[in-house]
Amino acid sequence: MTTPIIDLQIAAENSENLPSLAQFTQWVQRALAHEAQTEDFPETEITIRIVDEAESYELNLTYRGKDKPTNVLSFPFEVPEGIELPLLGDLIICRQVVEKEAQEQQISLESHWAHLAIHGTLHLLGYDHIEDAEAEEMEGLETEIMQSLGFEDPYISEKVIEE
């Protein structure tokens, strides 16, 4: 089984109760293997940076024009033509937003961290959720991957509300 290389950067002031490098690696690995439909996907490197609200706010404002911090930002790395590099991109995850959302949604913190690592990895692989059909496909993949890891459907609360 191929193991992705994860460069885990902790830029958050409070680093208590954060997932371990092994956890992030497992979550990203499962997303990559699911996408490749094989356990032996190409060598891949991803940077995961855990930040506080101030950095998330600045990045979200600069790159998305959104005047607030967000849970996860994905920055795919575009390798210049003719160069072979295993870099997939960077994920920026805001600790405070993750904790707040997990509490509001009444889900485990570990489950929400896993979901956002998987969600961000799928963005790095080219998935998006701007159009309804894209969102449905991406949410379906996230649900399959999360359930394969023993977590519940991350969108279950939204589905209950819709019914």
From Swiss-Prot:
Keywords: Cytoplasm, Endonuclease, Hydrolase, Metal-binding, Nuclease, Ribosome biogenesis, rRNA processing, Zinc
Superkingdom assignment: Bacteria
InterPro entries, sorted: MetalPrtase_cat_dom_sf_prd, YbeY, YbeY_CS
Entry EC number(s): 3.1.-.-
Pfam short name (any one): YbeY
GO BP field: rRNA processing
GO cellular component: cytoplasm
UniProt cofactor(s): Zn(2+)
UniProt GO molecular function: metalloendopeptidase activity; RNA endonuclease activity; zinc ion binding
NCBIfam families named among the record's database cross-references: rRNA maturation RNase YbeY (TIGR00043)
HAMAP family per the UniProt record, alphabetical: Endoribonucl_YbeY
Alphabetized PANTHER family for the sequence: ENDORIBONUCLEASE YBEY, CHLOROPLASTIC (PTHR46986:SF1)
Name assigned to this protein: Endoribonuclease YbeY
Naturally occurring in which organism (per UniProt): Actinobacillus pleuropneumoniae serotype 5b (strain L20)
